[in-house]
Amino acid sequence: MKNLAGLMKQASQMQAKMGEMQAKLETVEAEGSAGAGMVTVTLNGKGDLRRLHIDPKLADPAETEMLEDLIVAAHNDAKKKIETMAAEEMQKVTGGLNLPAGMKLPF
């Protein structure tokens, strides 16, 4: 019974740390770029788009398809960086315990 109480306490502490991590992820940002920096996007740790920069040279209507591709590529680049940051923070919180992404503790 003592082990169960210790496990419950540890799970509660881990849940609190995960809450702190979620709050921290709202404040961190990652920038992704494509086309040698002609398109850059900045996402917060939750994956929300915060900023988008498009080089004015890409404003040519004939380049619309390329511009769309570069925006998608820059967004995906930033998203990968955010996912890496989140995974690193999760490792710190869980002490290396590999939990599935998005797993909520039941305590």
Swiss-Prot record:
Pfam families: YbaB_DNA_bd. One of its GO terms (molecular function) is DNA binding. PANTHER family: NUCLEOID-ASSOCIATED PROTEIN YBAB. One of its GO terms (cellular component) is cytosol. Binds to DNA and alters its conformation. May be involved in regulation of gene expression, nucleoid organization and DNA protection. This is Nucleoid-associated protein GbCGDNIH1_0260. It is found in: Cytoplasm, Nucleoid. Keywords: Cytoplasm, DNA-binding. Homodimer. Belongs to the YbaB/EbfC family.
